[in-house]
Every structure is written in structure tokens, then in C-alpha cells.
């Protein structure tokens, strides 16, 4: 891919970022790095405290992993953090890219007539990750969110299920760009010999349904191991440890918090299957990483995982609400692997799936094309000041 004729000044706005680790943070970090590699000037504005460590205030400005980060204070709930000083950080941005649907999404949209910056947004699943406050969320989605989307030149969904959710409130249409994935990070790291060892990676949050995963582990019985890798969110390490102890799984299940990439890769090397009981995913980044590692995935059939299953037949889906059924699916996936009963076709062997569409150069190119269209649509791409009309 060649560098752009006119480098852009791109501002990413996201509520949580490095040094925090998670799917959203990884997506923004990788996209920012790839755009910088292409010659663009890239900044990230984020909140100055991690939700997992609210007592620690991070530096106002920092450069991490080659990315310029500006952090701002906030108040209110983690679900809708209020951070009005974001407007002081727009600077010379040619385009603002908002990630997720929260205060930033609404505030920058409603203030569009004043800041007049072209904007695109990636939904990352919106705010429907759990059923909590579902009626209020539905009302907000059909009201303020419906109004806010009109301020954006482009709305991007990470999956077809996400696109279906936002299409009814987005008159200009929704563009589907699957998240990019660092396919080299864990490439081929899975155990060469089949093991009754399971791995799950992700935030410790209610929508991940780690409680159901633990119930499936108890149903599996002796001889199985589960490694839970991630960072605390709305489920604490103490709560998880207590549940593991209550179920009598302390010898079978271990928690691994805040690991770096080499440490996670080492755990993958001791595992054969990836498992997820998640009820909701905006995309399913960890599952794609698992496929790249050569792990065999067994996952709950949420919309995002069902969409990925259509593309990647190695994935097994089962209802983790039924521990016995989930345990049976895990045993069957392991047996197919151990006995060599996996389809020998190239698309159905661990590590052999075609994942090229998720490579970051391809994904970044699609986003830059969207940016150029957004700038052209506002007149900014021709050096004119952006119009406030749509």
C-alpha cells in the first residue's frame, strides 16, 4: 500500500485506551499505528483514569507504543462518563474518529455546528452488551442516538449484526468493516499436542458470562483445565476467585490478570481449545486471535459469533446456558482434534483458516478510503471549510 498524497491529521476519541488492555483498546491502537505508518498524523484522546484503577490518574500527555495520547478528566458513571474538555483537544484535526456510543459520540455530534469537524464513528457494539437497563437503553437508542448519528459522515459497524442494529436509525446507511486483528501476535502458538486445556481471553465483565463458563467446567469433571486471561471490568478478581472456590474448581481453573503478549502466548502454548460463553460481542476479536493461534474455538451463539461461524467452519457453537450441553460440545471438539477427525479441508484445520481480511493494512486502507469520502463530502478534502449541513 502506498502512502497518501495528502497526509491527514486524524484524531481518535475513545473512553479507554493504553495502558489498559481489551478489544476496544487494541483495535484503536492498531488502527492508529497503521495509519501513522502510512504517513498520517494521528492522536488519541481518552479519559485520564482507567475504569479498573479509578484511583490512579494517568499523565495528561504520553507517547506509548508510538502513539501520541492526550488524556482528559471525567465525572459521572463509567457507562456514560462526562468529559466536556474533549472540545479543547480537537486542534488541527482534519477528521475526528469516535469509537463506541457514549458521551463522546453524543457530545461531538450535538456540538457539530460549532466545531465543524468531519466525523466518522465505529459503533463497537453500541451499548447493548448486557440486558441491564434494557428499556432505558432502547429509549436512548431510538431518541438521542438516532439524532446523533446524523452528525457523522460515516457510521461503521464491526459486524453484520451490529450493522442490522444501527441501520434503522442511520438514514445514510452503515458501512461494515470487520475489526482488524494482529494475526502475527499469537500465530501458531497453540499446543502442538492435543491437551484437555481451555483458554478464554477478555474483560472480566457480566456480558462475558464467566459464571456459565465455570459451570461448564464443573460439568466437564476431572482432567480438564481452564485458564481465564483478562482484566477486571464490572466483575472483580475477588468475585471470580470466590466463585471458583465455591464450585470447587481451584485446582482446575486459574486467573491470569493483566498479562503482556509474551505471557499470553505462553499460556496459549499450553492450551488446545478457546472457549467463550459471552452473551454479547460487538465483533469477536479474541476468537479471531484464537483461530490465528491454532486453537479450536467453542463459543456461545451470540450474533457476532454466529456471523463468524458462517465464515470460519472450525468454530463450534453451543448454548452455555446449559452446562451439560456446553461440556458435551467441548468434549466433542477435543475428541475431533485428538482423534484427527477434523475435516482435512484447508478451512477446517487449526491454524489453516483464511484470516487475511482481518489484516490491519487491509482494514486501515478501508478506513482511510472512508475518511477521504467524508472529507470530500464536507468540502474539507478540497481545502474548503466543512459545512454544517448534511
Question: Where are the language model's segments positioned?
Answer:
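Conserved donor-binding/catalytic core segment of Leloir-type glycosyltransferases
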Residues: 11, 190-218, 227
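Glycosyltransferase donor-sugar binding loop
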Residues: 48-51, 201, 225-241
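Aromatic "clamp/platform" in nucleotide-sugar-dependent glycosyltransferases that forms part
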Residues: 279
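Short alpha-helical donor nucleotide-sugar binding micro-motif in glycosyltransferases
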Residues: 258-259, 266-271
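Membrane-proximal helix-turn-helix segments that form the acceptor-binding/catalytic region
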Residues: 138-154
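Carbohydrate-associated surface elements
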Residues: 161, 180
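Nucleotide-activated donor-binding/catalytic signature segment of Leloir-type glycosyltransferases, i.e.
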Residues: 68, 238-259
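Conserved acidic donor-binding segment of nucleotide-sugar-dependent glycosyltransferases
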Residues: 311, 315-324, 332-338
Amino acid at each position: 500500500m502506498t502512502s497518501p498524497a495528502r497526509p491527514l491529521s486524524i484524531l481518535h476519541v475513545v473512553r479507554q485506551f493504553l495502558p489498559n488492555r481489551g478489544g476496544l483498546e487494541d483495535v484503536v491502537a492498531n488502527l492508529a499505528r497503521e495509519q501513522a505508518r502510512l504517513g498520517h498524523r494521528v492522536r488519541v484522546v481518552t479519559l485520564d483514569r482507567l475504569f479498573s484503577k479509578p484511583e490512579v490518574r494517568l499523565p495528561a500527555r504520553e507517547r506509548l507504543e508510538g502513539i501520541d495520547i492526550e488524556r482528559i478528566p471525567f465525572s459521572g458513571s463509567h457507562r456514560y462518563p462526562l468529559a466536556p474538555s474533549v472540545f479543547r483537544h480537537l486542534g488541527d484535526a482534519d477528521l475526528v474518529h469516535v469509537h463506541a456510543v457514549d458521551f463522546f459520540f453524543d457530545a461531538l455530534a450535538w456540538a457539530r455546528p460549532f466545531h465543524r469537524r468531519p466525523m466518522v464513528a465505529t459503533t463497537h457494539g453500541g451499548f447493548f452488551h448486557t440486558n441491564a437497563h434494557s428499556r432505558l437503553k432502547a429509549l436512548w437508542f431510538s431518541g438521542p442516538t438516532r439524532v446523533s448519528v446524523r452528525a457523522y459522515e460515516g457510521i461503521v459497524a464491526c459486524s453484520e449484526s451490529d450493522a442490522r442494529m444501527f441501520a434503522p436509525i442511520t438514514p445514510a446507511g452503515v458501512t461494515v468493516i470487520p475489526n482488524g486483528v494482529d494475526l502475527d501476535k499469537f500465530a501458531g502458538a497453540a499446543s502442538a499436542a492435543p491437551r484437555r486445556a481451555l483458554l478464554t481471553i477478555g474483560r472480566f465483565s457480566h456480558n462475558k458470562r464467566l459464571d456459565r463458563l465455570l459451570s461448564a467446567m464443573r460439568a466437564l469433571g476431572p482432567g480438564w483445565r481452564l485458564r481465564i486471561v483478562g482484566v477486571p471490568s464490572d466483575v472483580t478478581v475477588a468475585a471470580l476467585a470466590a466463585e471458583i472456590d465455591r464450585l470447587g474448581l481451584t485446582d482446575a481453573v486459574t486467573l491470569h490478570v493483566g498479562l503482556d503478549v509474551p505471557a499470553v502466548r505462553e499460556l496459549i502454548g499450553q492450551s488446545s481449545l478457546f472457549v467463550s460463553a459471552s452473551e454479547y460481542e460487538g465483533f469477536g476479536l479474541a476468537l479471531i486471535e484464537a483461530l490465528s493461534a491454532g486453537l479450536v474455538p467453542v463459543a456461545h451463539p451470540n450474533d457476532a459469533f454466529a456471523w463468524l461461524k458462517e465464515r470460519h467452519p472450525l468454530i463450534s457453537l453451543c448454548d452455555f446456558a446449559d452446562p451439560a450441553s456446553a461440556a458435551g460440545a467441548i468434549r466433542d471438539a477435543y475428541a475431533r482434534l485428538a482423534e484427527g477427525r477434523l475435516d482435512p479441508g484447508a478451512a477446517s484445520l487449526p491454524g489453516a483458516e483464511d484470516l487475511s481480511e482481518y489484516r490491519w493494512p487491509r482494514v486501515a486502507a478501508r478506513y482511510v478510503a472512508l475518511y477521504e469520502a467524508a472529507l470530500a463530502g464536507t468540502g474539507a478534502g478540497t481545502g474548503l471549510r466543512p459545512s454544517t449541513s448534511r
